[in-house]
Design a protein with these regions (language model features):
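Extended beta-strand/beta-hairpin segments
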Residues: 1-50, 61-150
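Alpha-helical metal-binding/catalytic segments enriched in His/Glu/Asp
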Residues: 55-56
Length: 150
């Protein structure tokens, strides 16, 4: 299907690849850190984190805008735990995403409803979380933790 997401990778040197997500735009680059690569691009783990974090940020923004709420600016940070599995192979064991919204949470209508549902509409994190735990935190401009509420 032509509407399905796709990318094209072209090896540049060693482990560095040009990644074309749109043939009409310049590529972004992926690479491995030394000793395999030269850190001339994001690592595959960083691309995974970016995909999860971007999708969750989009989903939260979309859900709030549905109620005509403006949480901007949004800044999201993502990190992961990497460890070895039972076969001693490196794996991403967990992903942590922290979404910071640019306004106090108490100024946003329907926030509780949005926070209870927005992750369910994130295609990437919902898919990734089938194999890797994805832990999400939402914090407002007053540095109040809005989600999870425990």
């Amino acid at each position: 299907m032509s509407g399905e997401p796709s990318v094209r990778l072209v090896q540049q040197s060693d482990y560095q690849f040009a990644i074309y997500y749109n043939e009409e735009r310049d590529p972004i680059y992926g690479d491995e850190p030394p000793p395999l690569g030269r850190s001339q691009g994001a690592t595959p783990s960083q691309f995974l984190l970016a995909g999860v974090a971007n999708c969750l940020s989009d989903s939260l923004l979309f859900a709030l805008r549905k109620f005509k709420q403006n949480p901007e600016p949004i800044e999201t940070k993502a990190s992961c735990e990497i460890g070895r599995n039972s076969e001693n192979r490196l794996r991403i064991l967990a992903i942590h995403v922290e979404i910071h919204i640019g306004v106090p949470g108490h100024t946003l209508e329907n926030l509780d409803r949005v926070l209870a549902q927005f992750q369910d509409f994130c295609t990437v994190s919902s898919s990734v979380s089938l194999g890797i735990p994805v832990n999400v935190t939402v914090i407002d401009s007053d540095n109040t933790k809005l989600y999870p509420t425990n």
